[in-house]
Amino acid sequence: DYYQPARGINRNLCGTPSVIALSAFEEGLNTFDGVDMNDIRDKSMALGSLFLELVMDQCGEFGFDLASPKKAERRGSHISLTHDHGFKIMQALIDHGVIGDFRAPNIVRFGFTPLYTSFQNIWDAVEILANIMDKGLWKDPKYAMRSKVT
């Protein structure tokens, strides 16, 4: 009957947020003061629609298919695309500063946080994606290495 701490990083797991973490959380909530949730949702839909339009225009030839609903009103603040080489493509995007998500077997997912994602961010991300696809940068073997977190 004695305490035996977990090994490795698991020793630092805690189920109760610290006072410092809660104060940071409270400050984060202040971001929403005076913000209309309808405005946030409208921008979210506009960001996603712009992304989808640009991807279809600039990357349509590269084998992407839409996995999310096409209508903005029917989807959340993200767009999911399928591609046979989705994992490698997402790793190349991350390496080039575009942070998205991969879900097996072939889904690349892009989230749009309207409070701090700009329309310019969308243009830049799609330009990077088009460059990666056009030049075949995703084919570099380093992008095939899998880790626990994608």
Give, region by region, the residue ranges found by the protein language model.
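A short glycine-threonine-serine/GTX helix/turn-capping micro-motif
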Residues: 1-19
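Conserved small-domain helix->loop->beta segment predominantly found in fold-type I
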Residues: 8-14, 32-82
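Well-ordered alpha-helical segments within folded domains of soluble proteins
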Residues: 19-27
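Short amphipathic alpha-helix segments
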Residues: 55-56, 86-93
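Helix N-cap motif at beta-to-alpha junctions
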Residues: 82-87, 116-119
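PLP-dependent enzyme catalytic core of the Aspartate aminotransferase-like
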Residues: 92-150
